[in-house]
């Protein structure tokens, strides 16, 4: 599916973590596909740059500085998006972080809390705040950006793995709860992508990751995100779509 086909023409997409990496790539791809894109992140300079790049190619975008660990900030994000574009059709829950890179025995509880606050509670806050707006549209899409580590775990990465496992379960529960409202909820697993988080796990080198894995650029994730966002109302829900070559 090519972005130039304008498959998302007129739709409004809110994307968290849109200032860099996968979130930024999806924001640019959705804009090229005709969506009005609301770029959310903690760092305003980064999402301002994303918006500038979208507008430079004739796209429509809005930057909203957001801290996904604060429910008030998340609520304001969706109020602002709706006031500006008239509603919300798509939510991409992408904001993520990893502050714990030690064994459970040696880990810092505060690092665990910070990781789960962003990856799991942040996802819950976004879904909780977005659902009323999606219902008003009569249908919608929620895409959670998960991780293979949430399905199989990773030594010295317990907090991140547990947060993504929780996100996958949240995805499945949301899909069941929102099925009557024609709101589909699916997980997108990018696999190994050259981003800050991936580099933390591999020390910046694919040699330290799975040798036969496909080491992607953020842009390589966009086609799958477009596919999920463009599915019909009766399309798949409660599913996990992965770009990994293997699951262990």
Predicted regions and their residues:
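Residue(s) in the substrate-gating loop at a strand-loop-helix junction
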Residues: 147
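Active-site helix of classical SDR
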Residues: 127, 163
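Substrate-binding pocket helix/loop in short-chain dehydrogenase/reductase
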Residues: 102-104, 108-113
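C-terminal helical subdomain
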Residues: 180, 187, 208-248
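Conserved glycine-rich Rossmann-like NAD(P)H-binding loop of the short-chain dehydrogenase/reductase
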Residues: 33-49
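Alpha-helical segment proximal to the catalytic Tyr-Lys
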Residues: 132, 176-177
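Conserved glycine-rich cofactor-binding loop
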Residues: 12, 19-21
